[in-house]
Amino acid sequence: MSPRQQPRRIARELALLSLSQIKGNPENLEQQTLNDLILVAVRTLTLEIQETLETAAAEISRGNERILASDTKATNLKSAQTMVKEAISLTHNAINRLGTVIDFPEIVQLSSQYEVREYALELIGTVYRRRAEIEQELTGALVDWQLHRLPRIDRDILQIAVAEMLYLDLPQKVAINEAIELAKRYSDDEGYRFINGVLRRVTNKLNESEKAVSTQS
């Protein structure tokens, strides 16, 4: 089984893409089928594709305006080139997301569906129930940032990782590595490096607290 098809890895992706749209109270979670989770995930990705393409179209339009004005100002041409490059990059990202939308349902079907559903719902429920404690840990590890100011996808990846470390008995190193993999797929280069740094500070503080408790006892 490829890493992408491992049930828990798929469950993390489902949880990440569903976290902002599914209420985590027990009554609601019990009613969620695997198909419900897949539908929410696909809708989330589709919305992101639409927003990315709209941004790319706006960049191309602005770049075209700068090119038309380039006869009078050389700086306009350079600025237009930058905008077009950004639009190409955004379009490339949207195409990658489209591939994920197409592949994701099949990948889920090829995995252990029961395990995927159970772990995805456990992650969503844990983040929902323990949000205050999780956010406290993350806030203490942020440097020159506020948690609510982070991009939603980065914030959700961080919350899932801390939930797994603190409440689902996932080893710290594994939780960090899995979070980085999620960030590489759904965030950007700056995002996954930022997430890596925050989670390492979280684990350092957790380990220091454990040592302090051991010393006192």
Swiss-Prot record:
Pfam families: NusB (PF01029). It comes from the Bacteria. The keyword RNA-binding applies. Keywords: RNA-binding, Transcription, Transcription antitermination, Transcription regulation. One of its GO terms (cellular component) is cytosol. GO terms for molecular function: RNA binding. Transmembrane segments: none annotated. InterPro entries: NusB-like_sf, NusB_fam, NusB_RsmB_TIM44. GO terms for biological process: DNA-templated transcription termination; transcription antitermination. Belongs to the NusB family. HAMAP family: NusB. Involved in transcription antitermination. Required for transcription of ribosomal RNA (rRNA) genes. Binds specifically to the boxA antiterminator sequence of the ribosomal RNA (rrn) operons. This is Transcription antitermination protein NusB. It comes from Microcystis aeruginosa (strain NIES-843 / IAM M-2473).
